[in-house]
Amino acid sequence: MREMFRAGVAALALVLAPALPAQTTPASAAKTTAAAPQTALAPAPLSELAASVALKHDSFTLPNGLRVVVHTDRKAPVVAVSVWYHVGSKDEPLGKTGFAHLFEHLMYYGSENHDALFFEPLESIGATDANGSTWFDRTNYYETVPTSALDLALFLESDRMGHLLGAVTQAKLDAQRSVVQNEKRQGDNAPYGLADYAILEGLFPAGHPYRHDTIGSMADLNAASVADVHAWFKANYGPNNAVLVLSGDIDVATAKPLVAKYFGDSPSGPTPARFE
């Protein structure tokens, strides 16, 4: 997790860093013939790059606001299931740094109708690539399952989207807080581990939502409470703040009734603020 964060910060620094001034050569070492000037090519706007990606897909939206994207690929009898929530570390209020990532961990430790480890039933049916991640702008959860086990994956994802809080306990919060803090210690003590913080502070001004790293501070993690978990879930984990992506051995005609069956009863949450 921390390695992914470090790679992302490094890439962000390359994108945002101003162009370096051209190196100058002392007159005594200058060549007698001047080199031909080079014209730098401006990068294409992100909107153009996104538009150039042509991946056939269908999409629809449930009445509760859940957006669904379906891409059909029949090469193998598997379906990749991915849920993207439009919330990340940029949404953390002052004094709550690291909470988006801490909450991601809690999502794997039981929901109201499956109060057990999220991974256990997936492993029993041969799922692969089951994991999650947190970044500035989003938190995502994903797994690839046999087509015959798609119902199970949708049930598990929908239960933690709509029915999580009844399974959250102080003991679970304390356990995952410890796990996240150990991740932080491991990252901080790795070579150049503290460089991440300096890079973000150098790139973004005080008060910018990207200025603090996703792992958060020890003090803020220690202060996280079950009440904070409830507030974060209610504010950010409604279906209207998420996108469900199904890719593989499935089509939109099959997906619509399945998604409605499992996600249709999840109530919409408030409309979160958007940073532009």
Language model features by range: what are they?
Residues P43-S89:
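Mature N-terminal segment immediately following signal peptide/propeptide cleavage
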